[in-house]
Amino acid sequence: MQKEMKMIKDEDVHFDLAVKKTPSFPHCLQPVASRGKAPQRHPFPEALRGPFSQFRYEPPPGDLDGFPGVFEGAGSRKRKSMPTKMPYNHPAEEVTLALHSEENKNHGLPNLPLLFPQPPRPKYDSQMIDLCNVGFQFYRSLEHFGGKPVKQEPIKPSAVWPQPTPTPFLPTPYPYYPKVHPGLMFPFFVPSSSPFPFSRHTFLPKQPPEPLLPRKAEPQESEETKQKVERVDVNVQIDDSYYVDVGGSQKRWQCPTCEKSYTSKYNLVTHILGHSGIKPHACTHCGKLFKQLSHLHTHMLTHQGTRPHKCQVCHKAFTQTSHLKRHMMQHSEVKPHNCRVCGRGFAYPSELKAHEAKHASGRENICVECGLDFPTLAQLKRHLTTHRGPIQYNCSECDKTFQYPSQLQNHMMKHKDIRPYICSECGMEFVQPHHLKQHSLTHKGVKEHKCGICGREFTLLANMKRHVLIHTNIRAYQCHLCYKSFVQKQTLKAHMIVHSDVKPFKCKLCGKEFNRMHNLMGHMHLHSDSKPFKCLYCPSKFTLKGNLTRHMKVKHGVMERGLHSQGLGRGRIALAQTAGVLRSLEQEEPFDLSQKRRAKVPVFQSDGESAQGSHCHEEEEEDNCYEVEPYSPGLAPQSQQLCTPEDLSTKSEHAPEVLEEACKEEKEDASKGEWEKRSKGDLGAEGGQERDCAGRDECLSLRAFQSTRRGPSFSDYLYFKHRDESLKELLERKMEKQAVLLGI
């Protein structure tokens, strides 16, 4: 007996020495005997021991083989299950435990291990769940270190799971996810290659004696795809104290924090981990954490663009059924969340909170018809038009309607003749600032838009588009009074002013009124010292474009569409040959030839084409130069007579000589053309003789007119020359002229 007591004391001394050399393990991990096995290796290789130094891992004591108990099954040395935790025994009972071990030796039974001394803990019921099924793993392979960083959340203390004490695997100074590696998430890492980070073989649970969750057969994997993992387990014990009797045969387990119950212990454990701030399931795309795997699967649908739940009313899709049900409350009359100020109902609490905040700040924009709230006042006004129709703002002067008050305000400035924007170059006034900006480009000489047919350049793109319609030879708009046709509708509208007594355009300096804007613009040059129209053949400059045209005809012999002084044919010259001269004559500034009150008369020239005043003007405005009231040269007052240019007024005595020279040149050209036609057997010789006679008659009539006039005027001569022509002949000649120009 004394011999046996001595052996027990020796074992106690040996046990004390082993305890001093062994670190304290958490209560959830039990030491495992390693008799007959290779010594346990460090869980991390040499390359990774530096980053994982905070885990404070130390090798187990080397003399654990001296322990009298080993874990052996019946005839098998492989451990198949976790060791059962034993309640703590008092040190006085250790002798009895040792004696029992000796008796078990004698009977051939497997020995029980001696536990490390631990503080007293409450005893647990035999029906405890081992959370090895939800254990966490480390992926040791460096291939998984390329993942995305995951949001870190510290552990929150709770009544169920108190603040953890410092342990080798969960140190206090570090959060739950320590900064081991920027791509590594503790307690486990999710490979970025898989679409869903967790599968049925992600967790490798231990095999408890009575597993609560049945294990499914794992698929066979090759050695290349298997991942080497080291297990770090966390256990939460769920005993019968969580059980709640709800009646019937169904068992439910209730959370003591929020009193939420579950039919499965596993679901309750997952719920408790959520209270502690643990969300083990992470999204590989955005790094968002979730408590349950099903929540992660639902979240992954948002990244895949899949929304299986669709609203039948507005066809809006959602990823979850709960979101669809909450959305359907908007289409129903049931609004559970009501405003305490105005009583308006809302489907969501967030909408009610935002609505009440507007009441507090006084920024609510609520429709009085349907009660809808809008972020801005402009959106509310736009919405009111659906109930009341579009708001119309009527002009009290002309009964025009406008959609916006700003449009009506700009329109009223025209009736009041208010033009606040004045050009500093020419003094023209405008109602809108952008009109002044467009006009200023004419003074700068900027012409960026060019016609692709005739090469004429324009300042504005709209003017160029309007000009291109001239080349189409399509005049769809016709005046019902004079049967004149126009390319554009607005040109016809401006033409109709000619047939009325209204003269809306008035000069503010002299009070003279005009029925067209371009006539007023040309008149304004008379009050200024500017002479923008310059002759190409001499240094002469003119205020009006019409004066320049007359100067070119009289002084330099440049007739309509031709350069007779250069010996070119009349009216048959290709448009490309005269494009350079014509572009130089074209100016953006309009001209005024209607200051004297004259009747609209057709113009006829010796080449059989019609001349409409200034032929350098646009086609749709050429025919309107002489459409004014009748005029008599002798009866017109001196103040209203046409202002002639300096070349005609100062050198009027040389005008007949210049005209005689021009007539001689025309006769020579006509005789040459007649001789060519006869040599070729042309049957149109009679027409040439008629044109020759017409040229001689024109020259003779001009001489008679100059001899009877003290102050010769070329415009008066044109009036007497063409006063007997009819409008029908003018239109026919104009169509012939356009056909020649277009090569038809």
UniProtKB/Swiss-Prot annotation:
GO molecular function, one term: transcription corepressor activity
Sequence motif: PXDLS, positions: 590-594
Consequence the record notes for mutating residue 590 to A: Abolishes interaction with CTBP1 and in part relieves transcription repression
Effect of residue 645 to A: Decreases interaction with CTBP1
SMART domains named among the record's database cross-references: ZnF_C2H2
Keywords, alphabetical: DNA-binding, Metal-binding, Nucleus, Repeat, Repressor, Transcription, Transcription regulation, Zinc, Zinc-finger
Region (Disordered): 206-228, 603-627, 664-692
Domain of life assignment: Eukaryota
Cellular-component GO terms for this entry: nucleoplasm; nucleus
Comp. bias (Basic and acidic residues): 213-228
Entry comment describing in which tissues the protein is expressed: Expressed in immature and mature dendritic cells (DCs). Not detected in other blood cell types.
Zinc finger map (C2H2-type): 253-275, 281-303, 309-331, 337-359, 365-387, 393-415, 421-443, 449-471, 477-499, 505-527, 533-556
GO biological process: negative regulation of intracellular estrogen receptor signaling pathway; negative regulation of transcription by RNA polymerase II; response to estrogen
InterPro entries linked to this entry: C2H2-ZF_domain-containing, Znf_C2H2_sf, Znf_C2H2_type
Consequence the record notes for mutating residue 647 to A: Decreases interaction with CTBP1
Location, primary (coarse class): nucleus
Compartment(s) where it occurs, according to its Swiss-Prot or TrEMBL record: Nucleus
Region feature Interaction with NRIP1, mapped onto this chain: 455-744
Function: Has transcriptional repression activity. Acts as a corepressor of ESR1; the function seems to involve CTBP1 and histone deacetylases.
Quaternary structure note: Interacts with ESR1 and NRIP1. Interacts (via PXDLS motif) with CTBP1.
Record's protein name: Zinc finger protein 366
Species: Homo sapiens (Human)
Gene: ZNF366
